[in-house]
């Protein structure tokens, strides 16, 4: 409501992030879990079925964010139309914006890459669940669930030769607890075994442990089982 009051005929989120202005300029890569559908079609809506006005991405972009993970438990909050509206909004962002999380449900090969200072990053994004909502009918795009090992393994194998650093967002765990559960541990280790370099965990809304894991091929993987999110 405050953002609407400030913007008049639009939403202005800048004041909410004013204290962060300039902070992210010091980093080469700024990644963010966008845990609501951002779009220009649906009215703004809160818990439990979220919708965020498109103006939020102007603020986030100006703060320095360029990489956005879109796969989480709220990805299906507005059904097929919500997916379409959100993807259309992100597609209209500047060319240096990278998103991942809504995959072509036939090929699963709309991969996301970013090259910074000569280093190529590959990004994948998955979720443990979508609050019980199934993949909507009438959409060509959707999320990949973390227990779909066959699809995930193929995506990792496809991307691995094309990037120097492969980063996976894993939306999983239990909200409101600092304790890492068995599903998180097992999933993180499995991802490490597939050759992932970095695992960024989201969903619990609190900070959990960071750790180095050794994959099946002797590779070393850094995992942060909960990172900061915006919702």
PLM regions: where:
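Acidic, metal/ion-coordinating pockets
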Residues: 1-231
